[in-house]
A protein has these predicted regions:
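Residue-level preference for short coil/turn positions at secondary-structure junctions
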Residues: 6, 69-70, 96, 122, ...
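Ser/Thr-centric signal marking residues that sit
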Residues: 6, 14, 76, 86, ...
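Catalytic domains of cell-wall/extracellular-matrix polysaccharide-remodeling enzymes
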Residues: 88, 134-242, 246-247, 252-256
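C-terminal domain-boundary segment and adjacent tail
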Residues: 38-50, 55-69, 96, 109-111, ...
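N-terminal secretory signal peptides and thylakoid transit peptides that target proteins
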Residues: 1-18
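Active-site beta->alpha N-cap acidic-glycine motif
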Residues: 52-139, 143-147, 154
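Bacterial lipoprotein signal-peptidase II cleavage site
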Residues: 23-32
Length: 256
């Protein structure tokens, strides 16, 4: 087994600067429609679900890509938006025999609970992408934890598991504070990414394919449900990966 590259190991000396940058990082996807403001997030429940970690960790470790050398990539999707578009994404990856990881927004799961089963039934992986997709790095500790905890509890309610990964919202890399609160919520690993498809900007299928073409063995790619351009780009992306000998697998498999 090979150790995945971690931001904490490679970039520990710059985490403080990253935290400041993340608080005002431009060019990140906005919160989905219907997102709740910080004050709308209730305090965490006093009793976590049985499926959550009984032994809270210290600060989580941020994972960006794998260093295993295996010819694999992880296509990771932010779970929000029209569930019919999500189904189209799942249909395409099924046709190509690929496996993906979906970091789901809690409010989306609450509104579309069948989506969790649809994803899991396809052999894909689910993880936590906050409750309401806010600019999380700007939150104080308590509401930041509540965003992670509420989505964790919804995942556990719908699937029996809180998922293996948390991903921060509206930021490519986690801040030190986000790593601390994710650890408190029972997540040992925060899943960031080294390749951003920028599909949330709706740049068109060709631009999305060109962005993902930068992926290499071990890459974690960020993509989104809810965007028709992503669906249109996906067959070409999967074909190009196959032509390069790269297999899309879940994040857990990539980082094993």
């Amino acid at each position: 087994m090979h150790d995945p590259l971690t931001r904490r190991r490679l970039f520990g000396v710059t985490l403080g600067a990253a935290a400041l940058a993340a608080c005002s990082a431009p060019g990140q996807p906005p919160a989905p429609a219907g997102s709740t403001p910080p004050q709308a997030v209730p305090p965490p429940s006093s009793t976590p679900p049985p499926s959550s970690s009984p032994h809270p960790q210290g600060p989580a470790t941020e994972l960006v890509r794998s260093s295993s050398g295996r010819p694999q990539v992880a296509l990771t999707f932010h779970g929000a938006g029209d569930p019919q578009v999500a189904r189209q994404v799942l249909d395409v990856v099924h046709q190509h025999g690929a496996r993906i990881t979906v970091l789901a927004v809690g409010t989306w799961l609450a509104e579309h609970p069948d989506a969790a089963r649809m994803i899991r039934d396809g052999g894909h992986e689910l993880g936590n992408h906050t409750w309401s997709h806010p600019a999380l790095s700007g939150y104080a500790a308590e509401p930041m934890y509540a965003e992670i905890q509420r989505c964790r509890d919804k995942l556990a309610e719908l699937t029996g598991s809180p998922g293996n990964f948390f991903r921060q919202s509206q930021g490519q890399h986690a801040t030190p504070e986000e790593l601390v609160e994710a650890g408190k919520a029972g997540y040992a690993r925060v899943l960031s990414y080294d390749i951003d498809s920028l599909d949330w900007k709706d740049p068109g299928p060709a631009a999305i394919r060109a962005a993902v073409a930068k992926a290499r063995a071990g890459s974690v790619v960020s993509m989104h449900f809810g965007h028709p351009g992503t669906v249109a780009a996906l067959p070409g992306i999967l074909t190009a990966l196959a032509d390069r000998g790269l297999t899309p697998v879940t994040a857990s498999d990539l980082l094993a």
